[in-house]
Amino acid sequence: MLIMKKLLLIAATSATMLSSSVSFAEGMDHEWYLRIDTGAAMFNEEKDKATGVKLKSNTTVPVALGIGYYISENFRADLTLGTIIGGKLKKSGAATNAPFTRTNISASHKPTITRLLINGYVDLTNFDMFDVFAGAGVGSALVKEKITYNGITGLSSNTKNRTNISYKLTLGTSAQIADGVKVELAYSWIDDGRTKSKNVIYQGTSVPTGGMHYQSHNLTAGIRFDI
């Protein structure tokens, strides 16, 4: 219930900001649009707090849906709701932190991330066939993770949702393929913040777990439909 209230508050704030942008352009003949994006993403490497093992990312699939508005010929803004599918930070190796030093383990951190962002984009160049644009976004992310260990018994755990400020920087290109339909190819860097830290008692010792910082490099394809 608390999570739903937070998301509703974030949505209301973002919608107000988007409405303000629309009001600024009131009286001009511009259009709303819907968008959908997906692609591939990799998280930055992170160190597992409990064991000291440096974790690497697999390839995850980001997905986002949104609604936006063309404020001017070269500027637009949108509100997007996104998540990830199948992302993990994992690694097998020898632990370096006590009390697990030199123990061969396998660590896995599987995050659940839901982000709501308000984004702004500006076209940097306009060619006959395509445009090049840059953008930035800010909003909120709900982040939690499932932590599992092989080789150590009783240390696996789950963290609860944490609400973080999320940031996004984008550089991409777009092209019109039909009347009112544009496609995009873009690179984005996204910072969703850290998960909650949690201490687990292992054989009488308090061991810190969680606290992963989820930053990702994203390559996505998207499509925009004017409405």
Swiss-Prot record:
- InterPro entries assigned: OMP/PagP_b-brl, OMP_b-brl
Q: Does the keyword Oxidoreductase apply?
A: no
Tell me the Pfam families matching this sequence. Answer: OMP_b-brl (PF13505)
Q: Which domain of life is it from?
A: Bacteria
Gene3D superfamilies on file: 2.40.160.20
SUPFAM superfamilies in the record: OMPA-like
Family recorded in the similarity comment: To R.conorii RC1281.
What name does this protein carry?
Uncharacterized protein RC1282
List the source organism: Rickettsia conorii (strain ATCC VR-613 / Malish 7)
